[in-house]
Amino acid sequence: MTVWWITLFSTYFLCLFARMSGKYKYVKGERVFRANALFAGMACAVLIFVSGFRQGIGDTGTYRDLFEKVPASFFGFLTHPTIKTDSGFYAIVAFIKQCISSDSQKVLLCMAIVTIGLIFITYYKNTDMIEMAVFLFITSGCYLVTMNGVRQYLASAILFFCFPMIYKRQWKFYLPIVLLCSTIHQSALIFLLLYFVVDQPAWGNTTKGILFVGIFLFVTYPVTGPLLARALGETQYGNYKEVLISAGAGANMVRVFVMAVPVVLSYLGKDFLRGKEKYYNICLLLHI
């Protein structure tokens, strides 16, 4: 816990200093705020260091064992008989082992550099309060999950970095990236649907529909939970079957309430945010 608190406070104050010493710049004709790159880079380095050199957090041991089994050459990866799913992820691991290092700890470090780096760069480019973005990233549990779900968060970080493409409607670039990310983790395929949904007006019919479906699934979880578990049982995620059935009503209620706070605040400030934040619709619907 000591490392955790040091990470939280050091990154918060480094990002606070970065914002306080930042300034407005013109990027492609648009006036945008940029925090001080030196302090922001130091905060990013702290997050990467803690993640990349972690020991015993979540599935870290499992991933390190897995990295050891992946061939240390790209040719060996192509001919490996047991790699059938999430092949893009294992291809990246094989590339790292061949070109950088075969040490599993260094593979973890490379994954942290890419995942945390992409997330942090996206925060840096799209928020005026980077210290709050990083604070919420850590305290909401997202930072911890990057260490537990390495495949999921690697794919998520790439798609998060590319989300401005949704706003610009650059589907010719975005959709192929989604398909590539699905080779890292198949859950990325949901973004094929989300591309056509999340740029709808906030608090319109789309928002109401998503909230209705979410509440419906929560209320009917005793019925829908086992159905979902049965569907997952025939896939690579079948190991989550028992968790879905035995976990009561799914996610921890405290986490649900915490994650609902930004939604409530965005509703209360919807009239102000609509005209000021260009990514308001996308961020709200993705969060919901």
Where are these predicted regions, by residue range?
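Start-transfer (signal-anchor) and selected internal transmembrane alpha helices
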Residues: 1-47
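Transmembrane-embedded, aromatic-rich helix segments that form part
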Residues: 7, 174-176, 187-198
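Short hydrophobic/aromatic helix or loop-helix immediately within or flanking a transmembrane segment
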Residues: 61-72, 78-101
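Alpha-helical transmembrane segments and terminal signal-anchor/GPI-anchor hydrophobic tails
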Residues: 61-64, 90, 195-288
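Loop-to-helix entry region of an early transmembrane alpha helix in multi-pass inner-membrane enzymes
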Residues: 87, 99-114
